[in-house]
Swiss-Prot record:
The modification Phosphoserine is found at S150. The keyword Calcium does not apply. Residues 1-34, 131-166, 185-293 are annotated as: Disordered. Residues 237-286 have a biased composition (Basic and acidic residues). GO terms for cellular component: nucleus. Signal peptide: none annotated. It comes from Pan troglodytes. This is NF-kappa-B inhibitor-like protein 1. ANK repeats lie at residues 64-93, 97-133.
Length: 380
């Protein structure tokens, strides 16, 4: 008798055959729907495209070559771009050439800057650092030049800042010691902890009064003038001298305070304006006291209110070292290039600028950066 061959159950066999077919059919349907979604976008039928994605939320809005965001930038289709961003399209998605949507928008020229480049940049600022296969970033395509935000530059700026602050602190301490040396009579006086300026001035006033009283007593012991007249005159003279001393101490305190503020302002230069310092919010009253965002005129331009980029660049150069000192002038221009580089400026001040003014401000910053680059090239 022959053994009967093992039989595979019908349900198991049908399941093993249907699974790959079902998966392939599902993938094919999804790809057809994604192609239909892209056709709707190309034809301008945005309502149908949105409805299709709502019925089938699993579709990939970035699928296709080139991706839909790249197509919208190339066709200058701003409504399609806004719809894709609202539906979750990724501006950092790269095509087969390594380009992101920001690369595609940057290649469309200045006309596409406000409607295409800025919305993509606002959605994904980190995409500015992505390079394509040619090694280009979106900023380099726009002509912004290489960014100066490398780790070495950051460390160099930090070391220069620390060096300047140490130098400033040393000068202030020297000036403080010089002022104290004018009034101290006893060099052996020691303090356990630093005393404030007001306590120091009060102590000097008391010591001066005690010294004067001692001199008066010694003078009275050697030659005794008439008691009533001499006593009243000495008190009047003592009060007058104490009053003059307090006035001089207050004047010196005000002078020191102004000197510290002036040196600190010179040390900070054109850094980010702080609420406690004079800045664009004091120059433009409409932005002060109510925490409003900056407009174009509120930005701390080199020239008040902005203006011609060449004029602003010339003003910055005029504030630096003389032309005879080529090395110092080049270092100064390098610092200004870092400060007014569009990438750096956007990272630091984007949250403080009105959205509808951002395009105009960044256009002026870009032009100023290019003018500074030309000045730096002229020194080579």
């Amino acid at each position: 008798m022959s053994n009967p061959s093992p039989q595979v159950p019908e349900e198991e066999a049908s399941t093993s055959v249907c699974r790959p077919k079902s998966s392939m059919a599902s993938t094919s349907r999804r790809q057809r729907r994604e192609r239909r979604f892209r056709r709707y976008l190309s034809a301008g039928r945005l309502v149908r495209a949105q409805a299709l994605l709502q019925r089938h939320p699993g579709l990939d809005v970035d699928a296709g070559q080139p991706p839909p965001l790249h197509r919208a930038c190339a066709r200058h289709d701003a409504p399609a771009l806004c719809l894709l961003l609202r539906l979750g399209a990724d501006p950092a998605h790269q095509d087969r050439h390594g380009d992101t949507a920001l690369h595609a928008a940057a290649r469309q020229g200045p006309d596409a800057y406000t409607d295409f480049f800025l919305p993509l940049l606002s959605r994904c600022p980190s995409a500015m650092g992505i390079k394509n296969k040619d090694g280009e970033t979106p900023g380099q395509i726009l002509g912004w030049g290489p960014p100066w935000d490398s780790a070495e530059e950051e460390e160099d700026d930090a070391s220069k800042e620390r060096e300047w602050r140490q130098k400033l602190q040393g000068e202030l301490e020297d000036e403080w010691q010089e002022v104290m040396g004018r009034f101290e009579g006893d060099a052996s006086h020691e303090t356990q902890e630093p005393e404030s300026f007001s306590a120091w001035s009060d102590r000097l006033a008391r010591e001066h009064a005690q010294k004067y009283q001692q001199q008066q007593r010694e003078a009275e012991g050697s030659c005794r003038p008439p008691r009533a007249e001499g006593s009243s005159q000495s008190w009047r003279q003592q009060e007058e001298e104490q009053r003059l001393f307090r006035e001089r101490a207050r004047a010196k305190e005000e002078e020191l305070r102004e000197s510290r503020a002036r040196r600190a302002q010179e040390a900070l230069g054109d850094r980010e304006p702080k609420p406690t310092r004079a800045g664009p919010r004091e120059e433009h009253p409409r932005g002060a006291g109510r925490g409003s965002l900056w407009r174009f005129g509120d930005v701390p331009w080199p020239c008040p209110g902005g203006g011609d980029p060449e004029a602003m660049a010339a003003a910055l150069v005029a504030r630096g070292p003389p032309l005879e000192e080529q090395g110092a002038l080049r270092r100064y221009l390098r610092v200004q290039q870092v400060r007014w580089h569009p990438d750096r400026f956007l990272q630091r001040f984007r949250s403080q600028i009105e959205t509808w003014e951002l395009g105009r401000v960044m256009g002026a910053v870009t032009a100023l950066s290019q003018a500074l680059n030309r000045h730096a090239e002229a020194l080579k």
